[in-house]
Amino acid sequence: MQSLGGIRSWPATWRTTTASMTTTTTESVRKVAQVLTVAGSDSGAGAGIQADIKVCAARGVYCASVKTAVKAKNTRAVQSVHLLPPDSVSEQLKSVLSDFEVDVVKTGMLPSPEIVEVLLQNLSEYPVRALVVDPVMVSTSGHVLAGSSILSIFRERLLPLADIITPNVKEASALLGGVRIQTVAEMRSAAKSLHQMGPRFVLVKGGDLPDSSDSVDVYFDGNEFHELHSPRIATRNTHGTGCTLASCIAAELAKGSNMLSAVKVAKRFVDSALNYSKDIVIGSGMQGPFDHFLSLKDPQSYRQSTFKPDDLFLYAVTDSRMNKKWNRSIVDAVKAAIEGGATIIQLREKEAETREFLEEAKSCVDICRSNGVCLLINDRFDIAIALDADGVHVGQSDMPVDLVRSLLGPDKIIGVSCKTQEQAHQAWKDGADYIGSGGVFPTNTKANNRTIGLDGLREVCKASKLPVVAIGGIGISNAESVMRIGEPNLKGVAVVSALFDQECVLTQAKKLHKTLTESKREH
């Protein structure tokens, strides 16, 4: 595989000294996470470098820009496209890269082989940590933005240098010579074929996939697939979704996230922005822009949209005794679980004093937030309030859900343990967000915990409108049998010892995620 200086030098889990925008190196010097976008200018400001700059600002990252083309565009149509001379693009690149400490370069519209060539030359001279390639050829609105003449240089020169590429299904098809991509299975096949062209990671976006009830993107790291699902949002304001997603990935990488976490944060950001902007009106055409600054204008709306039922897919419940047994901190355990594919974290602490637990939980909240993963506190709503955690999980003997809701407010996640149909009905009435049902199988994690079996789990699912996560004695050997019960509101499994009573949390999380993904695809 080719290399551009430092582009290939950073590991998948590379991190800066903090996950925030600025890192204090001395009392007077701060390092700022920096992205350079190399893309076209959009006069309507919904896509292109204008969108890239807004995204980076919203994510707390500095963004410089290099224009490759100037588009006259509004919500009705593209009126004209003017390509900048390669020399002009090269001068812009040298100007920025020779002065700024750019962490990540994100590319958008690269409209000619000559412009791709000057980009490659400058990156060879001025290496960066990561390269995010959004192969802009066909926009969300269907406009062709790059001709077939640059396909060969993309395949042969640019893609082998990319840390991640983010084509939509039309662009993926073009890169693969026009192959048919109309199903999730075909998206997975396309991602695998694109990976063979050299990028370290591939994200095939399925937002415009025909006959799909939800929005699904397929992520491939060369070994494992991750399907990222979210509900389709009915809105005309979808202009610039591809630019926004790729720029958000670049911003998160610049801050130090690993690739999968960056992708998850970016998808969540796009979904939240689309939902927040679904009713705004800018322009009179068929495809409007959306608002990238929702977290500043309406933080409540932004927080309310963070939890999705699919977050329950691989639910990791920590156990301090198990982590001590394997000589690791709760912080290291949470990091490894997330990197391995955990989609939500619950901190369960029964031994530590309040202050000790508070300090541990604060670090875990920061880790989860930087990786776009929700964190819940078991029982301790006081800790959840103090740290502004995403929510809590309570049992039947804990404070009632309706009272917890009155304390936490409407935007927090509340889960409740249920073993019976009656408890499941009550959880819905009291305003819970999800149900944890079990123990499905015998377990040593909780003393005197009654096992309900697969039939009991099925009854709880049938009795409730809420999403359900199964818990109790679940691991790699039996997770598939749990997911096979066929209830649509069963969204995942919660595990304790299957992750944390193991020598390597990362390895076990990856194996379990793979098992669940394959089970979901088969059923």
Curated annotation (Swiss-Prot):
The keyword Metal-binding is assigned to this record: yes
Pathway in which this enzyme or protein is active: Cofactor biosynthesis; thiamine diphosphate biosynthesis; thiamine phosphate from 4-amino-2-methyl-5-diphosphomethylpyrimidine and 4-methyl-5-(2-phosphoethyl)-thiazole: step 1/1; Cofactor biosynthesis; thiamine diphosphate biosynthesis; 4-amino-2-methyl-5-diphosphomethylpyrimidine from 5-amino-1-(5-phospho-D-ribosyl)imidazole: step 2/3
Q: Share an example GO biological-process annotation for this protein.
A: thiamine diphosphate biosynthetic process
| Compartment list | Plastid, Chloroplast
EC number(s) reported in the record: 2.5.1.3, 2.7.1.49
Entry's induction text = Down-regulated by treatment with exogenous thiamine.
List, separated by semicolons, the cofactors it needs: Mg(2+)
Q: Where does 2-[(2R,5Z)-2-carboxy-4-methylthiazol-5(2H)-ylidene]ethyl phosphate bind?
A: T443, N444, T445, G473, V496, S497
Q: Where is the transit peptide?
A: 1-38
Q: How is the cofactor bound?
A: Binds 1 Mg(2+) ion per subunit.
Q: Name one GO cellular component term.
A: chloroplast
> Tell me, what's a Pfam family for it?
TMP-TENI
Binding positions for 4-amino-2-methyl-5-(diphosphooxymethyl)pyrimidine per the UniProt entry: Q346, L347, R348, E349, K350, N378, S417, K446
Q: Which residues form the signal peptide?
A: none
Uppermost EC category: transferase
Please tell me where Mg(2+) binds in this chain.
D379, D398
**What is the top-level taxon of the source organism?**
Eukaryota
Identify the main location: plastid
UniProt catalytic activity:
2-[(2R,5Z)-2-carboxy-4-methylthiazol-5(2H)-ylidene]ethyl phosphate + 4-amino-2-methyl-5-(diphosphooxymethyl)pyrimidine + 2 H(+) = thiamine phosphate + CO2 + diphosphate; 2-(2-carboxy-4-methylthiazol-5-yl)ethyl phosphate + 4-amino-2-methyl-5-(diphosphooxymethyl)pyrimidine + 2 H(+) = thiamine phosphate + CO2 + diphosphate; 4-methyl-5-(2-phosphooxyethyl)-thiazole + 4-amino-2-methyl-5-(diphosphooxymethyl)pyrimidine + H(+) = thiamine phosphate + diphosphate; 4-amino-5-hydroxymethyl-2-methylpyrimidine + ATP = 4-amino-2-methyl-5-(phosphooxymethyl)pyrimidine + ADP + H(+)
Q: Which GO terms describe its molecular function?
A: ATP binding; hydroxymethylpyrimidine kinase activity; metal ion binding; phosphomethylpyrimidine kinase activity; thiamine-phosphate diphosphorylase activity
**Which Gene3D superfamilies does the record match to this protein?**
3.40.1190.20, Aldolase class I
Q: Entry's HAMAP family?
A: TMP_synthase
Role played? Essential for thiamine biosynthesis. Bifunctional enzyme that catalyzes the phosphorylation of hydroxymethylpyrimidine phosphate (HMP-P) to HMP-PP and condenses 4-methyl-5-(beta-hydroxyethyl)thiazole monophosphate (THZ-P) and 2-methyl-4-amino-5-hydroxymethyl pyrimidine pyrophosphate (HMP-PP) to form thiamine monophosphate (TMP).
Per the similarity annotation, which family is this?
A: Belongs to the thiamine-phosphate synthase family.
* Listed name of the protein: Thiamine biosynthetic bifunctional enzyme BTH1, chloroplastic
Q: Which gene encodes it?
A: BTH1
